[in-house]
Amino acid sequence: MSVIRPTTVEVETSLRLVAPDATALPVRASLRYDPADPYAVHVLFHAESAGGEAVSWSFARELLVTGLDEPAGIGDVRVWPWATPRGDFVALALSSPDGNALFEVPRSVLVRFLRRTYVVVARGREAEHLDVDTAVNRLLAGR
């Protein structure tokens, strides 16, 4: 009998990078959820179109879930609801030693993405999909 592995969820979207003067630039991004890493979501910012390099961030799926309705996160990744005259968005603030970035993400995109991740791994059932040996090996390898 073969075992069917859950599939990875990937969504391509456009975000807005909000500059300190409140102007915004569009940035293509890929949202990714892999059931082999059930607690995390991965975002790849395709900054190469603006002359930079692609940048990848990973953080807790639950952080996005909470940030849809209330401020969430401390430190490097913060998420909060952001209503504008153009519609409902979610603010995604990223901080690193190299700098800070504030992105405006359409709330509807995140809701659809998260719903698709729940089909693959239900909320609260992440531990059932965690391969502890692989996770420990990744930690020891520094990945």
Swiss-Prot record:
One of its GO terms (cellular component) is cell septum. Belongs to the SsgA family. It is found in: Cell septum. Gene3D superfamilies: Sporulation-specific cell division protein SsgB. The keyword Cell cycle applies. GO terms for biological process: division septum assembly; sporulation resulting in formation of a cellular spore. Keywords: Cell cycle, Cell division, Septation, Sporulation. InterPro entries: SsgB, SsgB_sf. It comes from the Bacteria. The gene is ssgB. This is Sporulation-specific cell division protein SsgB. Pfam families: SsgA. Interacts with SsgA. Interacts with FtsZ (via N-terminus). It comes from Salinispora tropica (strain ATCC BAA-916 / DSM 44818 / JCM 13857 / NBRC 105044 / CNB-440). Involved in sporulation-specific cell division. Required for early stages of sporulation. Important in the process of growth cessation prior to sporulation-specific cell division. Recruits cell division protein FtsZ to the future septum sites and tethers the contractile ring structure (Z ring) to the cytoplasmic membrane during sporulation. Stimulates polymerization and filament length of FtsZ in vitro. Its main location: other.
